[in-house]
């Protein structure tokens, strides 16, 4: 997978992709993340990429021309499966979306900034508008990093234990169950006995029931979604 991130603040992303799983994925050649400075695609002398909004509303707007020039240049080199715009008014990013996007070969992510981007850029180039939550950040860089991380870790060969990603929270619309490691008894706080039994069938049953209870308690919206799907399947 190749992810091209377009931003007017590239240094914000310098360190994020240089560590841990994301770094190893790139070293293995499994994933490639390329950050593009939008300012290199402007024709203005002082590298301006934003301007005042027509109509006089507050806040600056990213101009369509440098976005056009950057995306057009990238598309001249390869085909892209998706051009994603990170924006608070986009569709909320979830695990199912991550699963789907992780199958793509090439992706462009455009980071919003200031008051957003010229609507004409959205209409002409964007295939998916994505939000990571109902709140506003200073720019789309952190959101782009979140999406990139979620996609890359799903690619086969990235995680040392590939089953780990399949048992994460939200993969089956449930939160992940509680997990424990050594020691079995820490200051009187004891690991559930069933997890030490070696009985895989009973352990799996405990994990499902624990995940179900945690989801019901912490995310009733997900619990309701799961039970509806569960009932619809006749289980």
Swiss-Prot record:
Please list the residues that bind S-adenosyl-L-methionine: 112, 132-137
Would the keyword Disulfide bond turn up in this protein's UniProt record? no
The Gene Ontology biological process terms listed for this entry are:
tRNA N1-guanine methylation
How the protein assembles, per its UniProt entry? Answer: Homodimer.
Can you tell me which family this protein belongs to? Belongs to the RNA methyltransferase TrmD family.
- PANTHER family this protein is in? TRNA (GUANINE-N(1)-)-METHYLTRANSFERASE
Chain's role: Specifically methylates guanosine-37 in various tRNAs.
Protein name in the entry: tRNA (guanine-N(1)-)-methyltransferase
Q: Which organism is it from?
A: Cytophaga hutchinsonii (strain ATCC 33406 / DSM 1761 / CIP 103989 / NBRC 15051 / NCIMB 9469 / D465)
As recorded in Swiss-Prot or TrEMBL, the protein's gene is named trmD
